[in-house]
Each structure stands twice: as structure tokens, then as C-alpha cells.
Amino acid sequence: MRLLTVVLLLPLLIICHEHSHHHHDDEGSAVLTKVGLDDHELHEHDHDHDHDHKILRWDEKKNHSSHEKVPHSQLSTLKVWVFSLSAVIGISLAPCTLLFFIPAQHANGPFLKILLAFGAGGLLGDALLHIIPHSLNPHSHGAHDHDHAHSHDHAHNDHSHDHSDQLRVGIYVIAGILVFMMVEQLVRIIKGGHCHSHENGHIVADEHRHLNDDHHHHHNGEKKQEVEGLKDIKASAYLNLVADFVHNMTDGLAIGASFSAGSTLGWVTTLTVLLHELPHEVGDFAILVQSGFSKYQAIRMQAVTALGAITGCIFSLLISNPVLSAEGDTGAIMPFTAGGFIYIATVSVIPELLESGDHNNMSKVAKMAQSLVHLIAICMGVGMMYIVSLVE
């Protein structure tokens, strides 16, 4: 009987308990409603309050840690100048030293043609795989996560802004091609057309003919040929020197800004620029020799273009502009230079490779083999710049 009573009363007690608990929750909700809050708002308030505290603690920790790291990464003004200029001078001297070990050959020498093909590949790779991609995306991807929360509000504006920047880079590249074309045409008009690329074989033949005329007038003949050779230097050589000077200036800007940001970043940028400049300077040397310079004249002119790197470095250190970041974001200069490199490679260098077999009595098989070697050299130049871009 007692057991039956307990079984009958137990559900009733459970129902009363649940009703009392629900009534208590209703009273709590009513109190919150009277003060102008509901459960959802209270939850949001607690969440936001806790979130704000977390953000505050994280910001304090971040600022504290960054405050501790700054003295270790920053350099004094004197060290920044010494390190930056030393790095630029070292990068400028290293390729010039390497050029002394390249054997001197006349303009139609097979080894020089291979270097010329390597230089064409380096110019195209530098322009299309390094300079233009960098100009299209000059900023780091580290800000992606920070801006992700605002992507829904600004997606359309960001897309329009990026598209206009990409179009602007393309316009600068085209402008570089057109300006270099007009400069070469102007040089040809001023020099009376004596710098046309098809005359190179006749110039070399005339040089050998004069050398074999009379041994008694050998030294006078060499001096006369050197003077005449300077007059017959192709316009592509001058265009290449201008492009190198501007390109070296951007490298100097990058190195100066990198050492201003910290010693580690400065030396990493220096190593990257050095790896980039070594194959580039070898190709430029081949272009200058092919255009009419002697070996030592080409080396001297390469040293002159190195003044662009020193100028850019000094300019970067003087203005200390954060806009000139470690990546060397220099607006229109880089894509304009890329256009110049594309013009030199496609208009001045590659046609020389296509005509190289016409100056020699070579069989068709030998010409095909020579073309294959040139193609491999071009691919090696492009591949070198691709590797440098990946490392950078």
C-alpha cells in the first residue's frame, strides 16, 4: 500500500517541481524585462564584454612584445648607412669581377651567342616572372586575415581598386616598350642609320680585313677601328644601359629601405638581389659586346650602371619613406623598366639569334643544333629568374 502511494505521488511531485522551476525562470525573465534586457541581450553583453577584455589583453601583450623586439631589430643611423652602402657596392662589384673571367670573343662567336641567348631569357624572365608580378601584387598577403572580417562590406570596392591597379601596371609596361622604341628610332636617325643590326656582320668582316692589310700599321689600325667602333655601337646597347641604370636604382631603393627596417631583412634582401643580378649582368655583358663594345668597355659601362644602385640607396636612406618598402614598391618605375626589358629582348637580342646562322656557312643540321642550344640557353635564363622569384 505504501509502495502504491509513492508511485502515485512521484509524478505529481515531479510536475510541481518543473512548474516551480519554470515559474522561477519566468520571474527572472520578467525582472530582466523590467530593466530593459532580455536573455539574448544579456548573452550578447556578456559575450561582447568578455571579447573586449580578450582583445584588450591581446593588444597589450602584442604591444608589449613588439616593444621588446624593436630595439633588437632596429639599427643605428650610422650602421644603416654603412651596411646599406656596403651591400650595394658589394652587389655591384661581384658581377663585374665575374665578367673578367668570361673569354673575349668577337660579335659572332658561338660562346657569345649562347651568353646572348641566356641574357634574352634573363630579361624576359625578369620582366614577366619577377617585376610585373611584383608590381601587380606589391603588398604582403599577411593582411588577408585582418581584412577578412570586412570583406563582405568592401569586396566590390577592393575588386575595382585592384582591377584599376592592374590596368595601370599594364599601361606602364606598354609605355616602357613604346618609349624604348622611340628612343632607339631617334638614335638611329641621329646616327644616320649606321647602328642597324644587319650591319654587324659587315663591321666584323671589315675589322678582320683591316687587321690583315698591313702588319706595319697594326697599332694605328686598331686605334682607328676602336674610334669607328664607338660610332657603330647599336642603339640597343644604350637602351640596355638606361634600363640597367633604372633597374639598379630600384634595387638600391629596396636595399636601403630593408636595412632601415632591420639588419636581418636587409641582408636577406641583399642576398636576393645578388642572386638576381649575377645572371642578369652576364646577359647584359653579352648584349653590350654584341652591340659593338669591347670586353673592357662593356665591363666599364656595367660599372657605370651600378651608380644607379648607389643613387637609389642614398635616396631611400635620405627620405626614409615607409612607402618605399623592403620589396621596392616604386610605382611606375618597375613596370616601365619591365617594358624596356621586353623590348630589348624581343626586338634587339632575339633577332640577332635568328640571324646568327646566316653569317656562317653552316649546314642545316648545324643550324638546327645551334638553334636548339640557343633555346636551351634562353630557358636557362628564364629558369634562373623563376628560381630567384620563388626564393624572394
Swiss-Prot record:
Biased composition (Basic and acidic residues): 142-162
UniProt-annotated location(s): Membrane
Transmembrane segments: 82-102, 114-134, 170-190, 255-275, 304-324, 331-351, 371-391
Predominant place of localization: membrane
Region Disordered, residue ranges: 139-162
Position of the signal peptide: none
Domain of life: Eukaryota
This protein's GO CC annotations: membrane
Classification via Pfam families: Zip
UniProt record, GO biological process: intracellular zinc ion homeostasis; positive regulation of brood size; positive regulation of fertilization; regulation of egg-laying behavior; spermatid differentiation; zinc ion transmembrane transport
Residues carrying sugar: 63, 248, 361
Keywords: Differentiation, Glycoprotein, Ion transport, Membrane, Spermatogenesis, Transmembrane, Transmembrane helix, Transport, Zinc, Zinc transport
Membrane topology: Multi-pass membrane protein
GO molecular function, one term: zinc ion transmembrane transporter activity
Function: Zinc transporter which regulates intracellular zinc levels. Required for spermatogenesis in both hermaphrodites and males where it resides in an inactive form in immature sperm, spermatids, but is likely activated in response to reduced spe-4 and spe-6 function. Upon activation, mediates the release of zinc from internal stores in spermatids into the cytoplasm. The resulting increase in cytoplasmic zinc levels promotes spermatid activation and subsequent differentiation into mature motile sperm that are capable of fertilization.
Family: Belongs to the ZIP transporter (TC 2.A.5) family. KE4/Catsup subfamily.
Name the record gives this protein: Zinc transporter zipt-7.1
Species this protein is from: Caenorhabditis briggsae
